[in-house]
Amino acid sequence: MESKPFEVTALGRPLFPAMLYCCHWRIYFKSALFVYTTVKVTLVISGVTLWDKKSLSEDLDSHHQLLTDLKFSSSDSLSSKSSLLDVSASLKASFLGGLVEVGGSAKYLCDTKSSHQQSRVTMYYSETSRFDQLTMTKLGHIIYPQVFHQKTATHVVTAVLYGAQAFMVFDQMSSKDEKKQEIQGQLDVMVRKLPGFSIEGQGSVKMTEDEKKITENITCIFHGDFHLEQNPTTYMEALNLYKLLPTLLKENPQNAVPIKVWLYPLHLLDIKAAQLEREISTSLISNIEDIMEELGEVERTCNDLSRITMVNAFSDTEERLHSFQDSFSIYKTVLQKAVARVLPAIRGGGEKEQSLEDILKNHYSSPFNADKLNQWLHDAKSELHLLNSHTKTLEKIGIEDSDGLNTILLDPDIDVVVCLTFTSLKYEDPYLSTLKKFLTSDKFKELDGNKYELSVASDKKWFNNPDVIKTMRENLSHFRGFFLEANKDEKRISFIISAVSDPSNPGSSIYLYEKGKLTDAQFEPVSKPPLPLVKNVLEQTVSLKLQKYPSGETVQYRVEYKEVKADSGAEKGKEWLFIYTDHEDFTLTELESGKEYMIRYRVVGKVGVSEPSDTVSTRPSSAAFGRSALRTMTLNTIQVFFSNGHMVKVGNVAGSKEQTFQLKENDKIVSATLWPNHLLNRCGGLEFVIANNNSEKMSLSVKCELLGEPVRVDVKSGKCYGIKGRSGHEIDALGFYFI
């Protein structure tokens, strides 16, 4: 196979002239006593050499060979790393199989990113100092020919290029709010600028404040052949070291290490010597590299998922991820050992390349192929993101495991526990079961390449079910409103988040615990009620119509009101006063005539109270209502004014658009029509037909351009005694009461 000398990268291995080298294993032998380890066998061979020490010292040619190099790389792939170190395809295969133990600067090959959020740029510095080689005349004078009969080596080192290399690996993590591409570009610019920065007096570096701020978030990992008192860990430390690197080897030339070696085939010296029968094809090596890169991506994704708070918050999700990681780790190790087992056998002629192809086929057909691994990780990520989205708005509420929940339930100072419970986190994962089953199969243990595929049962994940998601959203809305807006200051009520397996309530449910016992597994807290209807306003009283809400059990109402001062704005002024009532029809009394009041109410359930309704504003007065006028202040505010100054308002923001309807004392409304907008989600227009004393009719209307179908209103006698509206950011409902 290799019938002529060739060169190979040292990779931090102590390779020196006259050392024996085995290309089957890609290992070297010391001239006296050496040990090498295979997958299953450990061999100890002593006293192996071709020449004595005296001959070697007399026939070694040494001369200076000075060269420096500086390169940058933004890639973390093994291919780009191998290119920087000038690693051959064959040596790369041995590294992937774990047959080569690297050292010094070559440890860079083992340094891979641990997270997808990690941006990385590498600076590579190299210099060579001298070149040593055995003279060709000495090669023919073999003093110990018995080495050829032992067949433990295939080559001998005839020349070594010495020097030193260094890799400075710069990393920067990007947060969820930062774009990784921007961080990567910023890091790349700063690393490439590093050689150009100058260090001035007292060690200060000439750079802008923005550049200094960027460097604060950059970390550095050093892999090198230089002897340092301390490795750099920051950008600034790396900058200082870079300025010193050219002097380190110059001042201490004895510290140079092998960078590259030249190997001479032993069978050219004696036909009986072992030789490299065949080499692994480049395409197969490329396939091995692709598989290992894919498994590395899987490992990074696992690391990112394990850092998500939700993983540790819920034991079921944590156990599934750990199970996946354990199975994955075992498989990756055994796969690597399988590759390591067949490589030497193929190179030595004991096996054909087909044995390696079979291992790769076995991988592609296994449940550990990249597509299946990534699909499971995608599902796991979806589940965790769903949990995170449901808890991030509830940061003030603790997430409790079963022990924490029991501790709270046993607390004598807590009467009621309201728990947002995730009910579907505990389940049997068929894919994880398949992974475990595959790892215990005979075919996996043998890894003989026979195609063996375990079927993975397809199952619909609970977190991909739209009906379940809809229910979870509703539960979250009820729970959040019940806690954040209404009852967070209630000392006797504790709000928590937990997980309890409950197939009857998939997704989530609100659990109610009273006196330490579960009393309702589908608790529906009282929700925000509709706007109160103002039925009548007199000098010191306001009559209200309160409305039940379908969500939750209504026990009482709590009517809240306060006076609004002229200079205080709508939401300011005095504190809210409140009165409890059991009746839907309720009259506020002892109000001051002529002053404006804001009124709202809450529904009181058996546990806690609801969020407050939207407010209505009214001004008690002793005079009759008289003539009225309807005014739209904006799309989300309506006011009704009466001739005596009385006013009723729906909505809360004043604006510029305005339309006024003026009615006289004896005017009668003959017909009324309302229109929704074209989207059917807002009030789009209204029209009144008015008849005066002389039976003359006129039309008063305000309409948007795009309308839906009209809705006719029964005006009965033509006298309007009430207006009802509902608003949020806009008026979305409007109605009139006629008698």
Predicted regions located by residue number:
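Lectin-type carbohydrate-recognition ectodomains
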Residues: T135, Q556-V559, I579-Y580, E611-D614, ...
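Membrane-permeabilization and membrane-interfacing ectodomains
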Residues: M1-E357, N362, E395, D442
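Pro/Thr/Ser/Gly-rich low-complexity, intrinsically disordered linker/stalk tracts
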Residues: A521-G552, S613-F625
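Exposed aromatic-hydrophobic patches
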Residues: D585-L591, F661, V711
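Beta-strand-rich modules
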Residues: L588-V607
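Long, compositionally biased eukaryotic scaffolding/regulatory segments
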Residues: E297-R300, D304-T541, A566
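Extracellular low-complexity, O-glycosylation-prone stalks/linkers
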Residues: T541-D585, R602, V609-T615
